[in-house]
Amino acid sequence: MKNFWRKLIGSAKKEVNVEKNRQAKGKLNVNDLIYSYPDFIEAEKNGNYKNLKVFDKNFLEAKNKMLPKKIEISFLIDNSGSMDEEKIEATRKTLTATLLSIRDFNLYLQAHAQKTNQKIELVTETWFFGQDHYKVKNFEDVKDLEKNKIVSSITKVNNNLGTTDDASSLREIYKGISSKQKSQIKNKKEYKIIFEITDGASTFPGATKDIVKKLIETDVEIYAIQIGKISKIDTKTFNYIWNDNFRYPHGIILADDIEKLTYELIRLVKRNLQSIFNDS
């Protein structure tokens, strides 16, 4: 991952084609020739055109991309009663790898801020949801405290929250987006990304679909990954919430391929961060 992050930082600069006039070589600029006609006559007499700057020439120049000032990444973890030991262990492993990898990227980003010529704030938060929901890591957590909260996020996955009400936590995240932040997100000065890990469809699919739609309309990137055996009805419900009637799918069903969870989540994180750095 460190090589990927390094290349990503390097892509913050792009080469642009810039045309400059009054050059010694290149394509003849008629206006410059007319303006410098006395010099042209003198050069013709001497047979020396080296100092005659009447040409246009294209140059490749390095230019900093306009990157966002802030990137917020939220992780929502299913902590409902149906999360068995295999799912919990896979989620712990995935959360560990992803949060620590993002932390590495953030440290690398701050250390190489001069390469981007811009300061970018990259922050994460973690939510657990079930019958109820609560936050175990805030955006504001930094340095050693952040590391402690990352560990706390991992150890608190313990399937003690009953039903699967992800709508409530998503709604709270949506309510926390101010009008100013919505404008910043629309103008790509900020990015907000949400990743959810769940073992089934929401207990309240209509409510979840509505809030997912609102978040997408606000230009928030949101994705869900389903793990564990899933019924046909729950598959249909999951697709209704996350994939149906959207421009592109936002939900991935892994079912029994739980071992792919870490790969899929990190792939989504990488893809989203790559799109920010490459498309800016």
Feature map (PLM): residue ranges:
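Acidic, glycine-rich A-domain
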Residues: 1-280
